Amino acid sequence: MVDSEWRPSIGGRLRRYAQVTSTMSGLAARLAGERYLGIELDRGKHANQLREALGSLKGPLMKVAQILSTIPDALPKEYAEELAALQADAPSMGWLFVKRRMRSELGEGWEDKFDSFNKKACSAASLGQVHEASYNNEKVAIKLQYPDMDSAINADLNQLKLVFSLYERIDSAISTKDIHSELSDRLQEELDYQRESLNMKLYRFMLAGENEVVLPEPIEELSTSRILTMSWVEGQKLMKYLETEPSQKDRNKVAINMFRTWYVPFYYYGVIHGDPHLGNYSICENLKINLMDFGSIRVFRPDFVGGVIDLYRALRDGDNELAVHAYSQWGFDGLDKEAIEILNIWAGFIYGPLLEDRIRPIQELRDGNYGRELAGKVHEELKRIGGIKPPREFVLMDRAAVGLGSVFMHLKAEVNWHQLFHGMIDDFTLEALQTRQTNAIREVGLSESLLGV
């Protein structure tokens, strides 16, 4: 535990900037030396050092690193692999921080509001930590945001922009401007726990008809913009669950429940939970899914969802004109025939399990490196034709698909993904999704500015 990180001061912010600048500038300098001076860089060694440096930093940079590790070739392979290893359960902050945070948010005598309060965090992540407590004789979870995260976001994202800009000079395959903008907006939203409380209500509304998912309920009188109190959900994390050696039937059931938990909101309401990180869900004894952490969600335009479905149909039918239309709906601009053919290679990998009407694993080859190797080939082809600029929407959509694919591979699930998918899209219309999305946003009190984003 560490209390020394309670630094809501100018000095603390300067130390933060200095630490992040040192870490990211070191990466930038090494990449520049490799590209412009012919200096041979031991990427594996330096990537490991980078992970260790970022792992010691609480806050958004660690979250950004986890996201970047799932975007094909946003960073060199060696760095992506090391950043993927960043753990959500970083060391928690101690009782001094907890007392200060709770008092500043709930006032003097905050302890009297609870029947009991566990001083030790039960989990810690990049932006905050969670404590167990009892309220009105019910078990609750309380998420406390780490200090000075708003300043940390500005420091981290400014330094990330430096690395992105330099990497683009070295490698022109991917333009990262919109990726940076998307990460910035989503991270700002994650710091607003009142917004997350509304997101939680949104998911409770959208998944009310799904019997195989359990969602916490926010407790408004014990929540602010920096602490979020919610009902407790009980379950096992994925890796612990797999240690129990569940049957193939049970693993398949968990996979189906996960698929519906993620994609019913998307295909019915145009909303995605963009963070299928191992710490954000657990598995009940009855195989239901506990979904947690609602900071990283995105509301899409209905025609974007239509574009996702149209791209599936284009790949299925070999319809190039429909593919052009679909990529346009995604937000890709100025793609020529060759660029679309290259993107279709990656799309074919992502959509592959949905295109085959049979029971199969999510990836026929169990080797988890296959997707990255394929992405590498796509990357080289994109670089050859001058590169593309992925739209903002791509970031969380791709992260969800790749992250869920990893979950299904861990489960070794064998499911008819085609039928699961068609069960959600066969009656799809833009008008019906727009109506459901509007009603859901209004029902929970989220800003209507989200509509049509």
Give, region by region, the residue ranges found by the protein language model.
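Short, amphipathic alpha-helical segments that act as regulatory/interfacial helices
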Residues: S25, K58-M62, K161-F164, K201-R204, ...
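Glycine-rich ATP phosphate-binding loop
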Residues: E132, E138-Y146
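Helix-rich C-lobe and terminal helical cap/extension of kinase-like folds
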Residues: E5-L14, G38-N48, I71, T224, ...
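ATP-dependent phospho-/nucleotidyl transfer catalytic cores
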Residues: K77, A84-P91, R103, D150-N158, ...
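N-terminal accessory/targeting segments that precede structured cores
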Residues: M1-Q129, N136, N154-T176, E381, ...
